[in-house]
Swiss-Prot record:
This is KAT8 regulatory NSL complex subunit 3. Disulfide bonds: none annotated. Residues 478-561, 599-618, 670-691, 735-757, 843-877 are annotated as: Disordered. The gene is Kansl3. Non-catalytic component of the NSL histone acetyltransferase complex, a multiprotein complex that mediates histone H4 acetylation at 'Lys-5'- and 'Lys-8' (H4K5ac and H4K8ac) at transcription start sites and promotes transcription initiation. The NSL complex also acts as a regulator of gene expression in mitochondria. Within the NSL complex, KANSL3 is required to promote KAT8 association with mitochondrial DNA. Required for transcription of intraciliary transport genes in both ciliated and non-ciliated cells. Coiled coil: none annotated.
Amino acid sequence: MAHRGGERDFQTSARRMGTSLLFQLSVHERELDLVFLDHSYAKPWSAHPDASSARPTRMLFVTPRRQQENTIESDVPIDVETVTATPAPLYDNQKARSVMNECERHVIFARTDADAPPPPEDWEEHVNRTGWTVAQNKLFNKILKALQSDRLARLANEGACNEPVLRRVAVDKCARRVRQALASVSWDTKLIQWLHTTLVETLSLPMLAAYLDALQTLKGKIPTLIDRMLVSSNTKTGAAGAEALSLLLKRPWDPAVGVLSHNKPSKLPGSPLILIASSGPSSSVFPASRRHRFWQSQLSCLGKVIPVATHLLNNGSGVGVLQCLEHMTGAVRSKVLEIHSHFPHKPIILIGWSTGALVACHVSVMEYVTAVVCLGFPLLTVDGPRGDVDDPLLDMKTPVLFVIGQNSLQCHPEAMEDFREKIRAENSLVVVGGADDNLRISKAKKKSEGLTQSMVDRCIQDEIVDFLTGVLTRAEGHVGSEPRDQDAEKKKKPRDVARRDLAFEIPERGSRPASPAARLPTSPSGSEDLSSVSSSPTSSPKTKGTTVTSAQKSSQIGTSQLLRRHVQRTDAVLTHRQAQVPISSEPVEEVEKEELRVQLKRHHPSSPLPGAKPSKRPKIKVSLISQGDTVGGPCTLSQGGTPEAAGGKPITMTLGASAGAKELTGLLTTAKSSSSEGGVTASAAPSVASSNATPNAIHTLQSRLVATSPGSSLPGAASASSLLQGLSFSLQDISSKTTGLPGSPSPGPAPQATSVKLPTPMQSLGAITTGTSTIVRTIPVATTLSSLAATPGGKPTAIHQLLTNGGLAKLASSLPGLAQISNQASGLKVPTTITLTLRGQPSRITTLSPMGSGAAASEEPNSQMLPSSSQRLPPAP
């Protein structure tokens, strides 16, 4: 009695909860785990390290087995005084009774002559069977027997606590018998029309109500045949009667209509696309079953449903079973790839019935999907049960939900448990009590539990929603955290110079197919962390080079370790490229290294915000490189070379971190040397920024400082000068042990663009097209040699004159043809970066010409050198 009282309390509380009623109908929600209640140290199933990926089985309406007591008492007390209250039904009883008696209230609309008196109770004796054929008598007797059985069931169930459910079961049984009787005459049109007219005119009102209930049930299953049957009566009753009868027979009544209307399923998170794999080749002769259509409409409440149909040529004539399965699998797989190409960020869920569930599982092994739902999974095959060593389904990595019936013939629950233990993927199992392969519960289960099929289907749908919500939430959180982590990584200041570069790492690919969304850039700006991919619009994707912007380089790296990591991680694309730079053979002292480290930390600013609006003014990068005289010629240095081997540590300085701030990057490499000659190089190169829409073209400007005549402003560069106005710079005094700088021209490096070798100085504006379709402009520029002289204080005046207010604008004004290059009509864009490289080298001048990420150096002839009238620059105090 205590158990019944607890069951009654649960039902009462469940009815109060309203919308969450159906989800709490399952047995696993009713039964409390006494171990978890009594023992606080109890752990969940997944706490064990050897726990498999199979989650505990969830039971829906599975009656727990209770062991019978062996001891039988001799005297059993019988309580005859206590009144047992009737348990409240799981649905709205008042509304269920209202729809149950609908046909009885409107039975008058079915009669052809509404004004005629109703037939008496002994109507069967007044039926005139004169002139009936044997087929007519036989058909009439079958229908009458089915209606009499339904009448007896109604009288027996009258007043029961769950009368609507019992009435629904009796009506379904009567409808099945009527359908069998009509099928015995092959649905002969004349015969079934005669039968319907006779029954409507002769049946009593209670029997006619039962007949209308049967027609209402059959109208939802076989509407065409029922409409053919009602043609003769519609002509007699008129338009009004026909319309009323049509509305009455529109859909069968359901006791749980109130509960289902209040418990609407919610949409799944992430707006997934639900693909329904077909269970066989589609055909116009055999359309999809009514139950499959019903489930398709139910799943449409969760998300966008896309049924995948398989069409065979010539209605499948000459096509074997294996070929048909290959066509079905290929159709689903092609649909998955098509959706991935159009909606790469949309999660895809595969759902299938029976054979379609197997197809969905096989497709999930080959292509990336978010989850798989198998309804009525067929575990038994013609070759035996699944789960052998060579079963490809054991390699599944996609989360999968199996929904099977307790009385299923193709899948036993115990065998399904063994199969789930072998699957590597996260999987769950839902067992529907008393259900068959199509998840339809039996009539005995409906009577004992007080359920209808619609309530069971809604509970199954709730289980599917619960499983998919967890999977989609975890997947959405995992994908959504990546761009947030990358943005935070860009904003914060890195503390370790030698930290690993995550942007160049290749993600490990497991046996599960990778998501297409992971292949797309997750940063809002479309660029990777620490790098931006730059290429020409006409260049192929294989020749794209990866460059590091000056702002990111100044804030995150101070040595050539980035280039080393870059080459190691992208050697598959860039192994054919090399870089040649002059190297000093003498080591750098530890004191100088320490000073450079201090200056490096002092001038490190925070890196700019990735989401800030880019400035329209060009950025200026100044590099000052001084090399020793021990360099006899160009030496080959891999990009993975250590900074110590390059003859010193570079110093990177940037002024301004906001979008509109002016930036200055000075790169200094010091080394012990006794040379008296060097080189001065100025080059202008725009930086390349890649965006989500279309990448900007690469336009490189290289200028030569030819120390022959005093610098003067040229009238053709007014627009370029206006671009650089207002830029103010300052450079901290740099302690150096280098010697004087002669005015020898040399093409400077453009670290953010593509350059080519220039054998001779060009005296006019020229264009050279490289292998990657990049335009290179070479502009000769005149300047004075006296500007490179040293001041009495020992500070290089050339740098100060170049970097003071207006000095860089004068330099831009001295670039001929810059206005023509920046002209929008010519198809080229305004330069975004001007790179100035001041290099001091021995008599043999070496040119660094980057080519994408790697570069090939070219040696300038001695004829390009100016008269040796260099002046020494003493070291700064």
